[in-house]
Structures are given as C-alpha cells and as structure tokens.
Amino acid sequence: MQQKRREPVQAVQVFGRKKTATAVAYCKRGNGLLKVNGRPLEQIEPKVLQYKLQEPLLLLGKEKFAGVDIRVRVSGGGHVAQIYAIRQAISKALVAFYQKYVDEASKKEIKDILVQYDRTLLVGDPRRCEPKKFGGPGARARYQKSYR
C-alpha cells in the first residue's frame, strides 16, 4: 500500500494595523482570489474606500496577484481604519509571499513600488489616541476657569 505524500502548502500569514483595527491576511498559491471577511473586494461600500483597497492591485498590476489567493479577516476600529489595515495586510502579505516562495529580486521590486507610492502600505502608523486626563473634558482641553 503506497501512501501519497502531500507537499506543504505554500502560504504566509501577515497582519496590518491602523489605530485599533487589525487585519490578518492569509496568502497562498492560487489563481488571483482576493476576499475580505469572505466577500470579494467589489462588494465593499462606499466606493471611495473600495478604491483605497484597490491601490496595491493597480500599482503592481493584476499579474502579480494572479498566482496567489489572499483572504483577509478584519476586526476592530472604524470603517476607514479597517480599510487602511486591510490594504496594509494585503501589501505585506504579497511582499512576504514573494520573499519566501518566489525570489528576492521581484520582492524588492514590489516593495520599492509600494514604498515609493505610500509608505503606510508596508509600515504601520504609530499614532494612537491620547488618553483623557482629569481636570478637563479631553486629553488636552481643560474645564473653563472663572475668577468671580
């Protein structure tokens, strides 16, 4: 009885973050499938945010995405923060996949194109919400002071 050997799946798992939104992208060999929370990119509303998500695809061209399937899970944050987290996760996943399974030259080419267009596609934005302090309604604003 001969056992079939299954070759390991070529896949990478990468996350993208913006404020409190976290997107986890799972990228494996495939045929150009791109889904966010189980839905295709075309179903994302409003259209303005959909265009933001398509930036990595438009920059690199469809042929770079043709050989991979990317599935993204996203949670936390607001609509815009989630979109930025997703586009970062997609970009980082593609770079990581090309580094691990394709070749270093094409990975560097992809990385250079993305960084030249918008650095936040690969590098996280460190800005966070400042905590509120006592003596005022917000982080910096103070309550009004009266002298008489």
From Swiss-Prot:
PROSITE patterns: RIBOSOMAL_S9 (PS00360)
One family name in Pfam for this protein: Ribosomal_S9
Keyword Transferase: no
InterPro entries: Ribosomal_Su5_D2-typ_SF (IPR020568), Ribosomal_uS9 (IPR000754), Ribosomal_uS9_CS (IPR020574), Ribsml_uS5_D2-typ_fold_subgr (IPR014721)
Keywords of the record: Ribonucleoprotein, Ribosomal protein
Listed GO CC annotations: cytosolic ribosome; cytosolic small ribosomal subunit
Disulfide cysteine pairs (residue numbers): none
BP terms from Gene Ontology: cytoplasmic translation; maturation of SSU-rRNA from tricistronic rRNA transcript (SSU-rRNA, 5.8S rRNA, LSU-rRNA)
Sample GO molecular function, one term: RNA binding
Similarity comment: Belongs to the universal ribosomal protein uS9 family.
NCBIfam families the record matches: PRK00474.1
The protein's name: Small ribosomal subunit protein uS9
Native organism: Drosophila melanogaster (Fruit fly)
